[in-house]
A protein has these predicted regions:
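Soluble FAD-dependent oxygen oxidases
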Residues: 2, 8-464
Length: 464
């Protein structure tokens, strides 16, 4: 019998809500009952999920002894590093010459990538603070990764993996941890007709490239595009690590045309938490293969190498660079609205990528790159927007005149070609002629040391 007020007397449209409320009340009541007040409490405790694991930290009683670390070092042939943060000099003496020299070096993202104690980002919206590991295994081969994973598991240690150090979530660093630093695992090998292991007869051969987990995208682009005449979808910033980008999905400058970088993944070698090296592809360990294409770097294992499908190059890569300042807040609102509308109407297509930024100083910075069209076509696309700017000189000023370039696609990441083709964009640093990245007609320093080799801002960090 249904009593007044029970769900059965409610209109049909309200019954689902009433049942949901009752379920919520039941769950809240059940959650409030102490575990020990229920029969079979031991069984319930054993069945309860472990929501957190307490790892051993430096200084804890269970922290490995010096002899333990030495045994690990011997196992990996002397590649264990005691991590020291270069920032320590600035904490101790912020006005010292050493600190000033460090901050000059920090302008070069390739220097940051070469230091195990540094990260390219820190404190994304103040959510975390970059902190160096205690030790790092400077892995040179898969066996080094296996040794590090086993050591961390057996000693209940925090374990982090760093390639490029670009993680916005801070997953490539952690205090009191052991780091697997993959920077030295940076080999690149091209294939004319690659078939994943176990996929013979199930998968058509594809042009592909196998890349070590520690390679930066600059190394991949140089091998695949400059030397090989092919394209592999990767990151817009060339200091990003290949493995981390793939495991995060992999959006890049030309993703509107080529898709996410993870979509090109054909196979990966992964060391899982049990210390086993596994090959993951569509034909074996398919669930792991699916998971690493977006699960986040190091979430499901340590990727040691990846094989990615390559594509034909377009005729040109190029870019449009400019900086426009509005002379009032109301003019900036007009500029913002116009830019968004123009982007929607003219740039939201497969040819265009990378960024437009709206700055607090009422300035609009344009650093757009393109593929599949040439300089003349790019100029025609943008002409209506720049005509609109020119019609209102009382409201807008051009801080950096527009620069539109195109480059035969094969040479987009070729420093020697850039030096020959853009001689006005050359500087000399420590006696060597180096290319500059061109942005809105102003040269921006690009440093060698495996440095940015592109005449476009997405190829490097901007330094004005």
């Amino acid at each position: 019998m249904v009593r007044p007020g029970q769900p059965g007397l409610l209109p049909p449209s309200q019954r689902t809500l009433a049942h949901a409320v009752n379920r919520r009340r039941f769950l809240k009541s059940a959650a409030a009952v102490p575990v020990f007040a229920i029969g079979c409490s031991d069984l319930q405790k054993r069945a309860a999920p472990r929501l957190a694991v307490q790892r051993v930290r430096a200084g804890d009683p269970g922290w490995p002894s010096e002899s333990d670390w030495q045994r690990l070092n011997a196992q990996i042939e002397g590649r264990l590093i005691k991590v020291q943060s270069p920032l320590a000099a600035c904490r101790e003496a912020p006005n010292s010459a050493a600190c000033r020299e460090l901050f000059a070096r920090l302008k070069n993202p390739f220097y940051i990538g070469g230091e195990p104690g540094l990260t390219q980002t820190s404190g994304w919206v103040d959510a975390w603070t970059s902190a160096p590991s205690v030790y790092a295994v400077a892995a040179a081969k898969t066996e080094d990764v296996v040794a590090a994973v086993n050591f961390a598991r057996e000693n209940n240690l925090r374990l982090v993996v760093k390639g490029g150090g670009h993680s916005y979530q801070g997953t490539s660093n952690s205090a009191d941890s052991l780091m697997i630093w993959t920077r030295a695992m940076n080999s690149v090998a091209l294939h004319d007709a690659f078939v994943a292991q176990g996929c013979a007869g199930k998968q058509a051969p594809q042009p592909a490239v196998t890349i070590g987990a520690g390679a930066f995208w600059l190394q991949a682009y140089h091998a695949v595009t400059v030397k090989g005449g092919r394209y592999v979808q990767g990151g817009g910033c060339t200091t990003v690590g290949v493995a981390g980008l793939i495991q995060s999905g992999g959006f890049g400058s030309f993703s509107k045309n080529y898709g996410l970088a993870a979509a090109a993944l054909m196979e990966a070698e992964v060391v899982t938490a049990d210390g086993v090296t596994r090959i993951a592809n569509a034909c074996q360990n398919a669930d792991l293969f699916w998971g690493i294409k977006g699960g986040g770097g190091g979430s499901l294992g340590v990727v040691t190498r990846l094989t990615l499908r390559t594509r034909e190059l377009p005729d040109y890569f190029g870019g449009v660079f400019c900086r426009i300042r509005a002379k009032s807040d109301s003019a900036f609102r007009r500029l913002t609205a116009r830019m968004i509308r123009f982007y929607h109407d003219r740039l939201l297509n497969r040819h265009w990528g990378e960024q437009i930024s709206f700055n607090p100083d009422n300035a609009l910075s344009i650093s757009m790159v393109f593929q599949g069209i040439n300089r003349q076509q790019a100029a025609q696309t943008w002409q209506p927007f720049f005509d609109w700017i020119a019609d209102s000189p009382q409201d807008f000023s051009i801080e950096r005149p527009k620069t539109i370039i195109d480059v035969p696609a094969r040479y987009f990441w070729d420093a020697d070609y850039m030096k020959k083709s853009f001689p006005t964009a050359i500087i000399r640093t420590t006696g060597a002629a180096l290319p500059r990245a061109i942005s809105c007609g102003k040269a921006i320093t690009v440093r060698r040391a495996g440095s940015c080799m592109a005449a476009n801002p997405p190829g490097c960090r901007l330094h004005y």
